């Protein structure tokens, strides 16, 4: 959530940044009108309260006490009625504020959509092949690693069963990713895959992405779409010490997404699934630590890809493609030979104090005052897409797939 006082005092400037993030202008107009109306109604309430305070003190020495008592009684009714008006406006403002995204950092390039994202650098050279390459789903079915038919039978479309060496490779990747992240100083945590609504609000999934969530019927529980949600919220409504920061955590989880609006995209294979696995990085830190932490997390995920021998690139997201809670995001895209292009495999985001304000995560600063932390998150890595990348980049002419050297000890 944005700082509403800052938004009110700098509305035009912040509104321009929000427009760059495709916030509906009608919503911004409603927000502006609310600020104006709330300011007017608060001023009237303060006027009534000032009258009450002043003349309550004078009641004992007043010459016409009964008349003043009557005036104070009437004024008390005005205060109650006006307080109700102010409370209703503040509640409405709070609801609208939950639907307003984070503002982009000044370093984020302006752009309408993913076509205007900016490539920062490429890492490693994509492999060349002297034979006709196959797509991962064809390789997987031939090797009996991927069973799409039975996945659909027991669930529905966008579900797959991993088998044999495919399942072993997936498990090896999870273990390797966790070990790699831990070697970089990230503490391993294991969290529930079902969380309550307050937790979803804390990191910004609700109310904006309600249609993309799987909700448990007749219960206030949701399946997580990323372990960023429970891990960040581990510290909701807490005040941390400076000595505890930065917190660096890594977490494996299954993730669940309805993929609303993704009809027709990546319908074959396991690139876009309703259920997938991911190893996440999450950091909670002081504001003056967040830029260094962003670079540390980005380097961790990029170095992990490099250790697997996978060519990839760093892509700075433009304002129009930036996520709801993020102030800045760099995507890592891995090379897929069958598509002859790079595909997203990780997003590293700095959310600044946006999630911390929603989740009420604070620390005691040097002046002894409570200050909001900064939160960051990033995939290190998406397991299914890493599996896809290895299958395609390590395929051989006979249809077999070599296992990267760093993974062999996990088999």
Swiss-Prot record:
Entry's transmembrane regions: none
Pfam families: Seryl_tRNA_N, tRNA-synt_2b
Binding site for L-serine: 226-228, 280, 379
Disulphide connectivity of cysteines: none
GO molecular function ontology, one term from the record: serine-tRNA ligase activity
Catalytic activity: tRNA(Ser) + L-serine + ATP = L-seryl-tRNA(Ser) + AMP + diphosphate + H(+); tRNA(Sec) + L-serine + ATP = L-seryl-tRNA(Sec) + AMP + diphosphate + H(+)
Annotated PROSITE patterns: AA_TRNA_LIGASE_II (PS50862)
EC category: ligase
EC number(s) stated in the UniProt entry for this protein: 6.1.1.11
A GO cellular-component term linked to this record: cytoplasm
Domain of life: Bacteria
One record GO biological process: seryl-tRNA aminoacylation
Keywords, ordered alphabetically: Aminoacyl-tRNA synthetase, ATP-binding, Cytoplasm, Ligase, Nucleotide-binding, Protein biosynthesis
Pathway: Aminoacyl-tRNA biosynthesis; selenocysteinyl-tRNA(Sec) biosynthesis; L-seryl-tRNA(Sec) from L-serine and tRNA(Sec): step 1/1
Intracellular or extracellular location(s): Cytoplasm
Function as written in the Swiss-Prot or TrEMBL entry: Catalyzes the attachment of serine to tRNA(Ser). Is also able to aminoacylate tRNA(Sec) with serine, to form the misacylated tRNA L-seryl-tRNA(Sec), which will be further converted into selenocysteinyl-tRNA(Sec).
NCBIfam families, alphabetized: serS (TIGR00414)
Comment on protein domains: Consists of two distinct domains, a catalytic core and a N-terminal extension that is involved in tRNA binding.
Subunit structure: Homodimer. The tRNA molecule binds across the dimer.
Family: Belongs to the class-II aminoacyl-tRNA synthetase family. Type-1 seryl-tRNA synthetase subfamily.
Protein name: Serine--tRNA ligase
Organism of this sequence: Campylobacter lari (strain RM2100 / D67 / ATCC BAA-1060)
């Amino acid at each position: 959530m944005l700082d509403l006082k800052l938004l009110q005092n700098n509305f035009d400037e912040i509104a321009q940044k929000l427009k760059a993030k495709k916030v509906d202008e009608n919503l911004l107009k409603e927000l502006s009108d609310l600020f104006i109306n709330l300011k007017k109604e608060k001023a009237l309430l303060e006027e009534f309260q000032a009258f009450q305070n002043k003349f309550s003190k004078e009641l004992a020495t007043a010459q016409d006490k009964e008349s003043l008592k009557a005036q104070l009684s009437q004024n008390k009714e005005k205060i109650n009625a006006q307080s109700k008006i102010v409370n209703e406006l503040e509640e409405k403002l709070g609801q609208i504020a939950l639907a307003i995204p984070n503002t982009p950092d000044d370093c984020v390039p302006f752009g309408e959509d993913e076509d205007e994202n900016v490539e920062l650098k490429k890492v490693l050279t994509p492999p060349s092949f002297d034979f006709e390459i196959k797509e991962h789903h064809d390789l997987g079915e031939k090797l009996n690693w991927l069973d799409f038919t039975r996945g659909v039978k027991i669930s529905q479309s966008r579900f797959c069963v991993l088998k044999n060496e495919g399942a072993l490779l997936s498990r090896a990747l999870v273990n390797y990713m966790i070990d790699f992240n831990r070697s970089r100083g990230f503490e391993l945590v294991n969290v529930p895959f079902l969380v309550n609504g307050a937790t979803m609000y804390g990191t910004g999934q609700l109310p904006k992405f309600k249609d993309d969530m799987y909700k448990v019927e007749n219960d206030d529980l949701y399946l997580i779409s990323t372990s960023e949600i429970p891990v960040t919220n581990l510290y909701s409504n807490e005040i941390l010490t400076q000595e505890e920061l930065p917190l660096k955590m890594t977490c494996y989880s299954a993730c669940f997404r309805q993929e609303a609006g993704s009809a027709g995209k990546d319908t074959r294979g396991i690139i876009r699934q309703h259920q997938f696995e991911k190893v996440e990085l999450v950091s909670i830190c002081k504001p003056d630590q967040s830029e260094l932490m962003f670079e540390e997390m980005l380097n961790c995920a990029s170095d992990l890809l490099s250790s697997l021998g996978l060519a990839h690139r760093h892509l700075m997201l433009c304002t129009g493609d930036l996520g709801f809670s993020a102030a800045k995001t760099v995507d890592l895209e891995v090379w897929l030979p069958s598509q002859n292009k790079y595909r997203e495999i990780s997003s590293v985001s700095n959310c600044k104090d946006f999630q911390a304000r929603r989740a009420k995560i604070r620390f005691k600063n040097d002046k002894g005052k409570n200050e909001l932390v900064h939160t960051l998150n990033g995939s290190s890595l998406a397991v299914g897409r890493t599996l896809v990348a290895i299958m395609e980049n390590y395929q051989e002419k006979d249809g077999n797939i070599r296992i990267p050297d760093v993974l062999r000890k996990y088999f």
